[in-house]
A protein has these predicted regions:
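Conserved Class I S-adenosyl-L-methionine-dependent methyltransferase catalytic core
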Residues: 7, 14-40, 64-175
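Short helix-to-turn junction characteristic of helix-turn-helix DNA-binding domains
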Residues: 41-45, 192
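Alpha-helix C-caps/helix-loop-beta hinges
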Residues: 44, 72-73, 270
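Short acidic, hydrophobic short linear motifs in intrinsically disordered regions
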Residues: 46-54
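Conserved adenosyl
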Residues: 113-251, 256-258, 274
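A short glycine-rich, Lys/Arg-flanked "PGG" loop and its adjoining helix->strand segment in the class I
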Residues: 257-269
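C-terminal alpha-helical "lid/dimerization" subdomain adjacent to the S-adenosyl-L-methionine
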Residues: 276-318
Length: 318
């Protein structure tokens, strides 16, 4: 038997206790979002459990226990003298304001899907098969949209589009844009709001997502210049697009090379292909950090199985 280093053992066990706490608190974050608890606290200053209960209509005993868990997690500040709880302005941006560029609740919905789909991914591991995007729990779809929408709101018009030479001017004048792998249409709608003279079509093979995207476009008031169609990355119709965009989806595709060839066929001669992907280093050792940990985990549960379920199955992963 190998000799055990007690110091290292204690450190690992201590770290896992912290992991247990993080995992146990995750459902409470989702509850805080679903029940409007964070929104009720955002900008309201210190409040007691009774006041939060009155604002939300929830039973005070539940409100108090939830607040104590939030304080233990460091998400809210607790005043032991006044017995009040406060969500900081920063906490409001991260937890209570869906349109904030720092909003992160969507990521918790993605984590929820990962747990709910555990048996399916386990089967794929054993069988060596894949798990299609459409086979996941529905909270993956909504969570992905909510998580990435914050970044699209913050970056698409101010920095990403201007990074393509002359593209902002073309979009302002009126261009044809295809958004491939659009999901619920967050990126498409952000672009349509920013460039009302252009026309946009979002493509996704997942029919429920396309239905949701159409409804979102109507709600946003951009349905006059935005349409959504069910189509894959290698089969979407249309020619002569001034811009084809792939936002956070290329690495999930089974045949990204085939998708790239199709993009070339559908672009105008002077068109541009815009690819936005989460940043990762090329070497494993350079990704052994908190962000890399999230990427490798999400890739194991979602991205790699998704690619392996498709033709070619290149499985780029994280």
């Amino acid at each position: 038997m190998q000799q055990i280093d007690d110091t290292r053992l204690d450190a690992l066990m201590g770290r896992l206790v912290g992991e247990f706490g993080a995992l146990a608190s995750a459902p409470l974050v989702i509850l805080g979002d679903r029940l409007g608890l964070y929104k009720a606290m955002a900008g309201a200053g210190p409040m007691s459990a009774d006041r939060l209960s009155a604002k939300t209509g929830l039973r005070v005993r539940y409100a108090r226990e939830w607040l104590n868990a939030q304080a233990a997690s460091g998400f809210v500040d607790y005043d032991p003298v006044e017995e009040t709880y406060a969500l900081s302005p920063e906490g409001g941006l991260v937890l209570g304001e869906p349109d904030s560029p720092a909003f992160m609740i969507g990521g918790y919905e993605v984590l929820s899907a990962m747990f709910q789909d555990l048996d399916k991914v386990q089967k794929a591991f054993v069988d060596g098969t894949g798990l299609g995007w459409h086979e996941h729990n529905a909270c993956l779809f909504s969570g992905t949209e909510r998580f990435f929408r914050a970044g699209y709101n913050a970056n698409l018009e101010p920095s990403w589009i201007p990074a393509l030479d002359g593209m902002a001017e073309r979009l302002r004048a009126g261009a044809r844009v295809a958004d491939v792998g659009c999901g619920f249409g967050a990126s498409t709608i952000v672009l349509a709001k920013a460039y009302p003279a252009s026309t946009f079509v979002g493509y996704d093979y997942h029919e429920p997502s396309i239905a949701a995207a159409r409804e979102r476009a109507r709600e946003a008031g951009v349905a006059d210049r935005v349409s959504f169609e069910v189509a894959g990355a290698k089969t979407y119709p249309g020619r002569g697009f001034d811009l084809v965009a792939f936002f956070d989806c290329l690495h999930d595709m089974g045949d990204p090379v085939g998708a790239a060839k199709h993009v070339r066929q559908t672009l105008a001669d002077d068109g541009s292909w815009m690819i936005v992907e989460p940043f990762a280093n090329d070497r494993v050792e350079d990704n052994l950090n908190p962000v890399g940990r999230i990427y490798y985990s999400a890739s194991t549960m979602v991205c790699t199985p998704c690619s392996l379920s498709q033709e070619v199955g290149l499985a780029l992963g994280a």
